[in-house]
Amino acid sequence: MSNEAKKHARTTVAVLYGGQSTEHSVSCISAGAVIDHLDPEIYEVVPVGITEAGAWVPGTTDTSRLRADGRDMPRVEDGGVHVQLTFGGAGTAGSAGSGAAGEMRYVTGPQAGEVFAQVDVVFPVLHGVNGEDGTVQGVLDLAGVRYVGNGVLASAAGMDKDFTKRLAREAGIPVGEELILFQPRELTAEEKERLGLPVFVKPARGGSSIGISKVDSWEEFDAAIDLAFSNDNKVIVEAMIHGAEVECGVLQHADGSIVSSVPAMLNGTEDGAEGFYGFDAKYVDSTVSATIPAPLPAETIKEIRQLAIRTFNALGCDGIARVDFFATENGPVLNEINTMPGFTPISMYPKMFAAEGVSFGDLVSALIARALA
């Protein structure tokens, strides 16, 4: 096969990153790692950045621009040239689920109207709202363009910690005590007694530890609530669960089979440690580390792996998820699910599968194969 024929035989993958989310920079870092591990002999990468204002712009394959440098986090800049993904070859939506190819075209700038790529599959490496919450997935579903990862329902439910716990409870998966607030208010004496101290106050729909506070006394509660509501209009107050934080990856193959990874234990959370990793620890100082596989009894590891798949199925997930638990004296308790887990250099999802012998490149290839199945 000639080099030109090989080029046309490659699968064209549009990698979306950035987005209108507090996790914008994390998405950029994840996308850089994904692009680095897409085999150029097999895939033609079309990077598309989404600015914090929501503009779609030509992205970069220079992944050095998609890395953190201390506190200097990568961002998608608007250079004035905008692009859009159109469908059906004429800018019209295809039938849902048709798996039609999309056209990536310029909509502003000197090449406005020009198609510069035929897209076989979209890899939405988007974290947080307006990307991981079912919004982008809905657009792609309506257009009939294939994409990596979860659909609208699983993405929306997984983004919302409240609905994740509701579905998990219905499926018989252990979860902790929580309280949902839609506006700041004082807790009642009964609520305080039920939750106890400390509590964690979180935006219900967010990630990367943004907007989260640990409250050790009720005098700290008002400030924690204000911070959480500055990031979301729905807040979850969770009781402290004593146990190590353990993460488990789930991967669905092209044939529909579902596997879970060996779990990872976040160091510093074992033996009832009561801290938590904030954004800086995860992405600026890089102080997060983990032991893989988690140093837990074989029976506990087996239970975590099974519960991860049960959670995946309870939410109707497809392709990918990372499921987080607390390993308590009485067994694993669900913390949350990530329907588009991070792919950054410190992210646990690729590391856990690497411990199973699945390389980063094989992992992203498996996810694309599932999307195209």
UniProtKB/Swiss-Prot annotation:
Subcellular compartments: Cytoplasm
Primary location recorded for the protein, binned into one broad class: cytoplasm
Enzyme Commission designation: 6.3.2.4
Binding site for Mg(2+) 2: 336, 338
Protein name, per record: D-alanine--D-alanine ligase
Record keyword Ligase present: yes
Described function: Cell wall formation.
GO biological process: cell wall organization; peptidoglycan biosynthetic process; regulation of cell shape
Annotated keywords: ATP-binding, Cell shape, Cell wall biogenesis/degradation, Cytoplasm, Ligase, Magnesium, Manganese, Metal-binding, Nucleotide-binding, Peptidoglycan synthesis
Binding-site positions, Mg(2+) 1: 324, 336
The encoding gene: ddl
Reaction catalysed by this enzyme: 2 D-alanine + ATP = D-alanyl-D-alanine + ADP + phosphate + H(+)
